[in-house]
């Protein structure tokens, strides 16, 4: 689950922490244009956001 990437609006987010007390995963988001070539190359195999 850690380092799983997903998209929220125009933000690319990744799961980066786990809270053992609550059992919840935490994530951070970076504002990266979805059609940006670098972002596509980096994330396309993970979650197919550039289809």
Protein language model features and the residues they cover:
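Acidic, low-complexity, intrinsically disordered interaction modules
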Residues: 2-51
């Amino acid at each position: 689950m850690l380092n799983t990437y997903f998209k929220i609006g125009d933000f690319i987010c990744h799961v980066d922490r786990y809270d053992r007390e609550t059992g919840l995963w935490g994530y951070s988001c970076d504002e990266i244009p979805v059609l940006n070539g670098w972002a596509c190359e980096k994330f396309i195999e993970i979650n197919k956001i550039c289809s």
